[in-house]
Design a protein with these regions (language model features):
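SAM-dependent transferase fold signal centered on methyltransferase-like domains
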Residues: 1-168
Length: 170
């Protein structure tokens, strides 16, 4: 299975089915992560797409961190199995910690890769992902006492992504 993976798609919470209808060559579904034997395509329902993921065989937690950091600096974990081992690897990485965003904001130019454990000694990692946010989910500072409220958070996300796509200038 691992040699065939050419792309991976992270579905939003509860939306695996619409995403599965868009993707061909599905190898397996791991929680919200859908693995495909086909090169990546842009989809409507993916929260994040892992372009050209690589299989990395590891011997230890330290070995995993070294191999990930040799590919790039910033990584985001998507954990669906072996949560404790994955967290230990994540702690060894020198990745920048995601911070809450204020609106309006410009997105960082630093690329953010995504990775997961497929089993105890195998990592699936992609240094090239479609979303600049950890697991495709932005975290804006929320004003809990007055406007703006939670409804504005989706608007903030949409406008921030529109700026990334050069559709608007904030």
């Amino acid at each position: 299975m691992t040699a065939e993976i050419q792309s991976a798609y992270l579905a939003p919470e509860g939306l695996n089915e619409p995403l599965l209808k868009e993707i061909e060559g599905v190898i397996s579904v791991q929680d919200r992560l859908i693995l495909s034997s086909q090169p990546f395509i842009n989809t409507y329902w993916a929260q994040n797409i892992w372009k050209n993921p690589k299989i990395i065989h590891i011997d230890s937690i330290n070995d995993a961190a070294k191999k990930l950091e040799s590919n790039q600096r910033n990584w985001c974990l998507y954990s669906f199995i072996l949560h404790r081992r994955a967290k230990l690897i994540e702690e060894k990485l020198n990745s920048r910690k995601p911070k809450l965003l204020t609106f309006p904001t410009s997105l960082s130019g630093d690329p953010l890769g995504s990775w997961c454990l497929l089993d105890e000694n195998t990592i699936l990692a992609s240094a090239d992902c479609t979303s600049p946010f950890p697991n495709g989910k932005p975290s804006f500072i929320e004003d809990k006492s007055g406007p703006p409220n939670r409804a504005y958070l989706k608007l903030y996300e949409a406008l921030t992504l529109a700026e990334k796509l050069s559709l608007i200038h904030i």
